[in-house]
Amino acid sequence: MKFNLTHFAAASAFVALAGSAAAQTEIKIGYALAPDSHYGVAAQKFEEVVLAETGDQFSFKHFPSSGLGGEREVIEGLQLGTIEATIVSSGTLANFVPATGVFDIPFLFSGLDHARAVLDGPIGQEILGEFDTVGLHGLAWGEQGFRHITNNRNAIHTPADVEGLKIRTMENPVHLAAFDAMGAAPTPMAWPEVISSLQQGVIDGQENPLSVIVSVKLNEVQKYLTLSGHVYSPAMLLVSKPFWDGLDDDQKAAM
């Protein structure tokens, strides 16, 4: 009798453990930059905060350095519900929520304080809310800074120095139109292809905030840096709408 009770207790414990493990939800979070980048640090902090608030209800799996694909592919994964979260540059988001394209207008903001006030105010929060209509949920804006130009062809001192420059941009209509108006040759390209394209001379340069330029060591493949500050480029913490809709109120509050 004791033998049977012992095995029954063991079996019951196994079932309880299996049920607990099954109840834990995995959050896959993908981003374009390295684990030690500002994206990686932010993703780790997001995990720490969520786990501190929810205990063992969630587990996190990080996919840095475009481990789940380019930014557009990852966002589409969020819409499908196959990826739970991402930290992404706002420049990609105009393809999904056109209103975000307003932030890509060159020289729109006078400085960081101006940009942050708009993003944290009614305009920024209203745009965050629009993501719910396209299978996404915007949790928060994040800091990246102003975008600057790097290239291998020549130093840039005047607008004429940009003439004909093959510069990688995101697949963003405002970015493309702006560089086209300057006389450059804007080339939309997914981020995972950029470094090799610079090395092979497919493109002359690219433009990004200093946080990205430093993180990916563009100084190793580019000769010139121009502190143009032509566009303020916020990041965004996004989650999948199907994932978000499956959370209870306490879990949503933790995020």
Regions found by a protein language model. Name each.
Residues 10, 24-114, 122-254:
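N-terminal secretory/targeting leader peptides
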Residues 14:
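Expand to "…catalyze enediolate/carbanion chemistry for C-C bond making/breaking, isomerization
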